[in-house]
UniProtKB/Swiss-Prot annotation:
Keywords: FAD, Flavoprotein, Signal. FAD binds at residues 38-67. This is Putative truncated GMC-type inactive oxidoreductase R832. Belongs to the GMC oxidoreductase family. Coiled coil: none annotated.
Amino acid sequence: MNPTKLFLVFVAFAFAIINALPVCRQGTFDPDYNGIPDYIIVGSGPGGSRAVQQCIAKGHKCTLVERGYDYFEVPYVQTPSASFLVYSSPAVRYASTVSAKNLFNLTVNAIEANVVGGASSINGLIVVITDIDNFYRELNITGWSYEELLPRYLELMTSLNRPEHTGPLDVSDTPVSDPAYQAYRNAIRQVFPNIPERLPDMNTAFANQNGTNFPGFGPPETSTKTTYMNFAGANVPIVSYRESAYMAFVHPIRNHPNFRLMTRSRVDKVVFDVCKTRARKVIVTATNYFGSQYQCELTARYGIVLAAGAIRTPQILLQSGIGPANELSALGISVVKNLTDVGRHLDDHPTIVRQYIGPIPDNYYSANINGHAYWNYQDNASVIPNWAMQIAGVPGINFKTVLSVLQIRNHVVQ
């Protein structure tokens, strides 16, 4: 080889070494940190937790990368009744969008999980089987129809109302005799006298009807694992804790030799090969226990699974060069794939939840028991017409959660 060319190759090689990021040691396997995982799963919410469980079950070495804290670093997430403590803890991050044109240039505030288990570690513990309309049967994608996926949903759960299934996720039912549910039902009947009640619970009714003719209400199942003890022939609940995705899927494999967990580690981008066809490396910004940040990289032998949620997954894709080419180029991001819909069409949650503290208005219908349920046929006519169910919290603390079914017709949402 020409000496000049040899020198240039040497310089390029040296430059690459000098600028290379260190290996993310927390995500490797061998003592010398050269043992790379077979797969990297980004995000430890329900999707990522289930993915890593299946990854280990198939005999692979798998690293789960989570931006937030380890599960037991935030003790409140284990207690079902401690939501108000969770929302003021490090398990939660608060984010705001930029002004959105389709929302009259208003911003949207979002609560994001910042702990292993993702949203399942901080949410309202309601277990809902995805509605049949969300399976996109018109796309005719093999293996993803409602009929094919419903058995998989059922196989994930262990429920008193579906004893034929024993999955890793324990769910608890809400008895029809529960005073809070009775108040809820009475309130609904006052406003919607003809709406059908779905028993023994919403999920079982949905499964029994094959997802057809489903609109209605019923007792919810909750993602709590409850231990019962028999007293005088009756099963009495003794203790209950949150059955998060972490507890159901990750905790049982926590000490498996093929499993690694990186916490406080934010994936900034996915790195593709020169042909822009394969991705086997992620760039990570990690935070140590002293609060100092550093960048590192982690390589997978076979592939990377993005399961960082409805907000952060498209963000990582965009930062990696996958998205609207003109917008990426304007930001100086090298385009890997022009996909115009990435980062758009966000559809993340079936309800709108509003919480506030204040007196109970006199014009509310109410079932007057502890855990009051209130209905107001028009919450604020000057802003938006809607139906609003309100459930008061702990007696003595007038804290109400509002679930709204919005009927929007050219009104500003505030």
